[in-house]
């Protein structure tokens, strides 16, 4: 099982920093003794947030998610988090989950990357209609605090932003190249415009704010880095988009969790000296730090311009639009890149968190260097636990080569078989030799597979069968990876 994204937080160092701030009396202000609902609570950030709220003494933490399980669900239940399965697009589910809550942290969303980005209707349904359902339930149950986890895409659409801040205007809705950015922008504006709205019974008001993170990283992150690593492992990170000087924002998971909790504190209306005037009410905040990636696999050797990459992204978008009925199927791989993703990686855009620092006392819990070190360590450990192997091009070469030999040696002369037979005879002279080469190759592959299984039982027992099948298919091209792992195992 993957480790919890927030297994522990060093509260002493955090408390020392927070005591210097004037907004709150303690790190648990507004958390201790309160009931929280985290929509999207079984996700990577949502689970980390739930665990941290429990650690800070929340009376009850509810995880509200469409799924009934995730890699972190056992940790949540063992920590006392109440996991509620429901759909944010169903009013009755939302109403039931939010009943009796003191604060709602709305993280549930759809369409951030990959195939999800092309499911426009689902993006609107979850991001806009779902947020409307949350707002409606918040007013019905007179919940005074709502933190909306938005995205920097509400102000970014492919044009360079250098050290941007909260004064940037919303990116025009009609100019967004993806449904995710557009729908999140609409939802954020709905949330912020609801700030200060009184409840029907009078007296109390709803206070809202929005947090605008960028791409999230950290140990166990399950969306961005796995996709990058898988592409690198298959040898499909063929090019880099944009200039070498491009800078983009990433945020470490623990820093984002801290940001969301501080934002919820900033909506309190009973802070000494600020009664009735929550510092964060109606405000959006950026919580970001520049992030440089480092991978053990081969990095892209070529660079293409943003316009060329956008054209390539449009081609993939067109192909996958035709495949729309099957976008939710697991067997359909992720598109290599889409237009919105081109802008995210190929155009400089980074932001200042000065406003969050001044108004909420936000100081990143971990530096980019610390966060990157923890993430790399996690991926190195994960790589050691998984089956390693050659790129997809090696797979294609071996499979095509063996298939061609089999076709040349045994299949009737139809289709490409005459050409393959002529090519095989050019190298091996006789049909007997062609067939012998194929049989010997198969025998050698199976023999190597058996040896790989035997060796893996000693150095990588969890993946022994995987090594057998992969080496039986690829022979030496797989065996060399196992031999390297065996060498590392003996040196450890």
Predicted features, each with a name:
Residues 81-129, 137, 141, 157:
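NAD(P)H-binding glycine-rich loop region in Rossmannoid oxidoreductase-like domains
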Residues 193-268, 291:
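NAD(P)-dependent short-chain dehydrogenase/reductase
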Residues 253, 312, 317-325, 330-363:
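Conserved C-terminal active-site "lid" loop/helix of NAD(P)H-dependent oxidoreductases
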Residues 266-336, 373, 383-387:
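Mid/C-terminal beta-alpha module of Rossmann-like enzyme folds, strongest
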Residues 129-182, 199-202:
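Conserved Rossmann-fold NAD(P)-dependent oxidoreductase catalytic core, especially the SDR/UDP-sugar
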Residues 34-56:
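N-terminal Rossmann NAD(P)H-binding glycine-rich loop of SDR-like oxidoreductase domains
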Residues 14-15, 24-25, 35, 348-359, ...:
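Amphipathic terminal alpha-helices
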Residues 277, 384-492:
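Aromatic-rich, lipid-facing transmembrane alpha helices and their immediate juxtamembrane interface loops
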